[in-house]
C-alpha cells in the first residue's frame, strides 16, 4: 500500500457508489484507505467485503483483455487510492516488495473466501 500511496490518486466514494462494473475495461487498481467496499460477481451470488488496507481490481491490469469480472460498490464513505497500469507496472519493476505485498493481500483474501465456502 505504501508504494501505491506514493504513485496513486486519491478519490472518494459515498455509500452505494459504483466504483467499477463487471464487463468494463479496467485501467487502474485500487487500494482502500478508509471505509469498506463490496465486490460481487456471478450476478451478485458471490461477494466479498474489502476493508481498509486491502487492494482490489489489480486483475484487470494483468489479464490480456483488461476486463473487470465483478462489481465494486462502496458500502460506507470510502477514500481510495487509484493506480493506473503504467504506474502499476513501474511499481512492480522498481519495487519487488510491492509485488510481494500485493500477492500476500490477494492470497489472504483467497484463503478467507475458501474458508467461507467451507462453512456454507
Kindly give the residue locations of the regions a language model identified.
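A small-molecule sensor/coupling module
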Residues: 1, 68-69, 86-120
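A short glycine-rich, His/Asp/Glu-containing loop-to-beta-strand
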Residues: 1-10
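Cyclic nucleotide-binding regulatory domains
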Residues: 9, 15-77
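Flexible interhelical turns and helix-capping residues at alpha-helix boundaries
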Residues: 12, 43, 92-96
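Alpha-helix boundary/capping detector
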Residues: 30, 39, 61, 82, ...
Amino acid at each position: 500500500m505504501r508504494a501505491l500511496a506514493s504513485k496513486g490518486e486519491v478519490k472518494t466514494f459515498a455509500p452505494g457508489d459504483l466504483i467499477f462494473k463487471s464487463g468494463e475495461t479496467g485501467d487502474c487498481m485500487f487500494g482502500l484507505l478508509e471505509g469498506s467496499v463490496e465486490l460481487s460477481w456471478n450476478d451478485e451470488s458471490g461477494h466479498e467485503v474489502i476493508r481498509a488496507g486491502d487492494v482490489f481490481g489489480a486483475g484487470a491490469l494483468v489479464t490480456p483483455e483488461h476486463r473487470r469480472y465483478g462489481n465494486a460498490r462502496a458500502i460506507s464513505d470510502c477514500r481510495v487510492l487509484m493506480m493506473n497500469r503504467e504506474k502499476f507496472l513501474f511499481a512492480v519493476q522498481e519495487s519487488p516488495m510491492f509485488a510481494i505485498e500485493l500477492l500476500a493481500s490477494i492470497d489472504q483474501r483467497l484463503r478467507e473466501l475458501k474458508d467461507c465456502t467451507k462453512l456454507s
